[in-house]
Amino acid sequence: SIGLGHAANEELKFVFDEKLVSTPTFAMILAHHLPWLRQPETGIDVRKMLHGESSLVVHHPLPKAGHVTVHGRIAGVVDRGPGKSVSIYFEQRVIESATASHLATVGGCFVFPGAGVAVGATGARPGTTPTKVPDGCADIEFVDHIPKNAAQLYRLNGDRNTLHVDPEVARRAGFDRPILHGLCTFGYAGAAAIRTLCDHDAGRVEKLHVRYSTPIYPGEQLRTEFFRIDTNEYAFRCIAVERNVTVLEAGHLVLRNEK
């Protein structure tokens, strides 16, 4: 929560241990361990891996303490042909160990540029078609300032990829400096929804989906633009303000009714 900029006043409950409430996007951290990515027999080169999409469905509010079991599966593989990209879609079910309660379903996609081998495209994208963000002005906007130490703070959650902290590694990957974790940017989008649309009630977030477009750098401003589709449904995108580039696109948010 601290890594997403939650602090005082209405957000004290997200950072004060005596009144602690979990944020819904914490489920992404619980489900982040994907051991198959590093198994030699897969032939996957994680150094060339890009984060393509992330999705979250919250079935029950996350407890502030406890143990969970994560059941994962490969949901689909799309090979776009020789010299083109391969996309691997996955799904992780977060289960509370003590009660067997299904807390959340986390999905996502990793993209491997140039890894295609099939003659002709094979496979199909699982799930629904990504949401198209409408043209025109957003119904609601929220601007966050991403702290310069945001990647170091988020790294404490267990994502130790040096791309987000080592300037030399970032330069070798083609970036000016270390970039912010994609899942941290996802978390900022969720936090913007809680602040602007949910009156700080984290329990109202039911579904969240994004497609990653361009990384954002710590120290930049992030503008989240929400477009109302229905009473509790929004399309959204996130923009790095200083460079005026979209960093999260095809965003889709579904809220629960107010209690």
Go through the PLM ranges and name each one:
Residues 145-223, 227-234:
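Acidic/His-leaning functional-site neighborhoods
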Residues 11-15, 25-28, 43, 48-49, ...:
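Residue-level preference for alpha-helix termini and adjacent loops
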Residues 49-142, 216-219, 223-259:
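HotDog/MaoC-like acyl-thioester-processing domains
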Residues 16-20, 30-34, 53-54, 60-62, ...:
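Solvent-exposed, flexible loop/coil residues
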Residues 1-69, 257:
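Hydrophobic, proline/glycine-rich low-complexity stretches
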Residues 27-29, 33-37, 48-52, 67-72, ...:
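A short linear-motif detector with a strong N-terminal bias
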Residues 1-21, 110-180, 194:
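Catalytic strand-loop segment that frames the active site of acyl-thioester-processing enzymes
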Residues 1, 26-27, 73, 109, ...:
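Residue-level recognition of well-ordered secondary-structure positions
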